[in-house]
Amino acid sequence: MTSGPQTILHVCSRDLIRQLRDRILASHGYSVVSTLSVTEAEDLYAKSHFDLVLVDVEGDGRIPQAEKLCSDIRHKDPEQKVAFVCNYRVSKISDCPNEIIRSEFNPDAMIEGVKELLG
């Protein structure tokens, strides 16, 4: 068990949204490491511990990329918590993620989803 704030790896291809979410998460006491790139997310994950990997799945081709990232992470650590952030239905075929947080334009819903998932 670690002391200090819980750490979130936030993956979002939309820079403005990424920055906004990072600020919202930080204002609620979370330590946030974020990236625009799935490839960079994999590198960051390999180097550090994260309590949650939060992946934005909005945009063309983002769901398959997010599912692959989730699968790769779970292969390395089956206990890692992963959540997708979206405002529409995501495929239920995948065993990833732990949670789908539907909160695209609602910061309170995003924080509530994160809190529920992290306990």
Model-derived features: positions:
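Short acidic, S/G/P-rich loop/turn micro-motifs used as interaction or catalytic elements
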Residues: R14-I17, V55-R62, R89-V90, P107
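Conserved phosphotransfer microenvironments
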Residues: L54-H75
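Output/docking surface of receiver
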Residues: A83-G119
